[in-house]
Amino acid sequence: GALWIIGNEGVNKPTWEAVNHGWWTGVDSDVCLTPIKDKVYQVTLTVGKQLRATDVNFKFFGQANWGIEFKGQDNSHLISTDSEVFGIGDGNGHDNGNVYLKDGVELKDGETYVLTVDLTAGVDKAVLKVEKK
């Protein structure tokens, strides 16, 4: 399996400016996370390159297209996080399942974040872990 990021024009690889589509789908537009072990996926994003410092807004999908998506509530595929940097919308004023920058957090160009999605407990108990490098 694979896990994909689909989001606004502020997240992409090799740079968000080079692939500035915003919520387009397909392998040419979306970011595929790397499987690092069974049911665990990872992506590294550098602020100012692959991730814009403001207006963070993306979500995780089970394919490079609309379909299976991870949400914060009321869905068969659920994701949560205890990150102090990023939150996941779950009826808290952010779209259900969308990753956003938490209030009061400021990203700086050059900072690098490793995002790991762990599905080992099941697709209804996915966990996003965030590590600043």
Regions found by a protein language model. Name each.
Residues 1-52, 63-86:
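Aromatic-rich carbohydrate-binding modules that target alpha-glucans
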Residues 59-61:
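Extracellular recognition modules
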Residues 123-133:
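Short, low-complexity, Pro/Ser/Thr/Gly-rich segments in the mature regions of secreted, periplasmic
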